[in-house]
Amino acid sequence: MDLVTRRVRGADAIAGPLLFLEGVPRARLGELVRIRMAGGEERRGQIIELSGARVAVQVLEETRGLAPARAEVTLTGEVATLAVSRGMLGRVLDGLGRPTDGLPAPIAEARLPIHGAALNVTRREKPADFIETGVSAIDGLNTLVRGQKLPVFSCAGLPAGRLAGQIVCQARVRGGERFAVVFAAMGAPFREYDAYLEAFRRAGVLDRTAVFLNRAEDPPIERLMTPRCALTCAEHLAFSHGLHVLVVLTDMTSYCEALREVALARDEVPGRRGYPGYMYTDLATIYERAGRIAGRPGSITQVPVLTMPDDDLTHPIPDLSGYITEGQIVLSRELDRRGVYPPIDVLPSLSRLMGLGAGPGRTRADHRPLADQLYALYARGRDVRRMAAIVGSANLGEEERRLLEFGDRFERELVGQGDAFRSIEDTLETGWRLLAQLPPEALARIPAAVLEARRKEGQR
C-alpha cells in the first residue's frame, strides 16, 4: 500500500459483492473506497470488516468485469454520507440518493452520515397525535400516531405494494401542520417501480414526497443503504425544517435477504433460517430512527412493509420486527380471496400506541369505545362463521345470525373500502351505521354517556 496516496494495487480475492485486500494499515470501519478497474472505470465501495491489515470491501455497484489482481483501490478517509435538502421533495432518486428523473441533483443544505446520529434517549418524546392514512382499518381500529413505527405484515401475492402506495397518496396530518412523505422501495421490479411513480403523479402528491427506488436489478449492497439514505433525508426534513414526516419502507424482506447474502459472502456463521445473528440489531438501527425530539417541532413516523416468507408469522423477519416496532397491520389471504381490499385482518392487527392518537382533542371522543365495540362484535362474528361452517347457517339462532351478518358487513363496508380515501369522520360514521342494525343490549362496551350523546346528536 502507498501510505501517501493510501492506494492499494491488486486485491487478494473477490467473493460475490465483496473484495478482500491485504496489507492495508490504518483502514477504518465504514470508510469509503474508490475501486479503479483495468479499463479505467471506477466503482465505489465501503470497508465493512477489519482483521489486522486485511480488510473486506463491500462493492456498492456491479462487480461484473472486476479482476482482483488488476484492481486499484484508493481509501478516501470518508464515511458514507448523503447530501440532503428540502429540495429532495418532489424528486425521484435511486437507492443511494442519486437523481434518476433527469434533473440536476438538489442543492445540498448539509451532508449527513447515512447511519444517523445517536439520539439522546432522554431527549425523546413519546409519540402523540394522529396521522390520517385514509384507510378505515388503520385509522379507526389501529390508529397511526406521530413518532410511531407500525409495520405492515403481508403474504406473498397480496397487494401490500398497492396499500403502501395508497398510504403515501392519502396520508395527512390534521390542523394544517407541515407534512411530507419519504418513500423507499427495495428490490422493486420494473412493473412496481413504474406503478408507484404513476400513482404518485396521478394523485398529485409527488411534490411533497421524496422517492428512493432501488430496483430488483440493482446490486443487493445498494439495498442495504436505501432505507438509511431515506431516513437520513427524513431526519433532515423533520428536525431541521420542522416537518412531520411519514417514512414508508417496502419491502423489508428484500432488505433482509440482501443482508443474508452479504453475510454469507463474508463466511459468517448463519443464524435462524440462514440470516445473520445480528439481524435484530441491524433492523433496530433502522426502526429506532422513528420518533420525536423534545424541543423540535418535527417527527418521523415509520410504516415498514414486509412479506412473511411462507405466510409464517414466526419467521425471523416479522418476528424480530415485531419485537422492535409498536404493533402490526396484518394482511389476510382469506380476505383477499373474497375480494376485500385492503385485505386487513383487524383481529391480529394492533397499534400499541393507539391511545396516544385517538380520542378527545385528537380524533373524536367516541373513537376508542366505538373501536372496542366493533372489535368485540367482529370477533364474535368470526366465531359464529366458523361454527356455521360446521353446523350450517340454518341451524343458527337469531343472535348468531345477526352476528354473522354483522361480520360480513364489517368486512364489506368498513374494511373493504377499495382505493377511495375515507376520513376519520367517515370511518367512525360507517362504524355507527353497522352498530345501528344491532339491539342496544349488544353494545355493552360503549358507555351509556357515549350512547346518549350519540342519540341526542341523531335527533338534531
Swiss-Prot record:
Sorted UniProt keywords: ATP synthesis, Hydrogen ion transport, Ion transport, Transport
Record GO biological process: proton motive force-driven plasma membrane ATP synthesis
Keyword Ion transport: yes
Keyword Ion transport listed: yes
Pfam families cross-referenced by the UniProt entry: ATP-synt_ab, ATP-synt_ab_N, ATP-synt_VA_C
InterPro entries named among the record's database cross-references: ATP-synt_VA_C, ATPase_a/bsu_AS, ATPase_F1/V1/A1_a/bsu_N, ATPase_F1/V1/A1_a/bsu_nucl-bd, P-loop_NTPase, V-ATPase_su_B/beta
GO molecular function, one term: proton-transporting ATP synthase activity, rotational mechanism
NCBIfam families in alphabetical order: PRK04196.1
Role played: Produces ATP from ADP in the presence of a proton gradient across the membrane. The V-type beta chain is a regulatory subunit.
HAMAP family assigned to the protein according to its UniProt record, in alphabetical order: ATP_synth_B_arch
Stored PANTHER family: V-TYPE PROTON ATPASE SUBUNIT B
Family, as annotated: Belongs to the ATPase alpha/beta chains family.
Annotated protein name in UniProt: V-type ATP synthase beta chain
Originating species: Anaeromyxobacter sp. (strain Fw109-5)
Lineage per the UniProt record: Bacteria, Pseudomonadati, Myxococcota, Myxococcia, Myxococcales
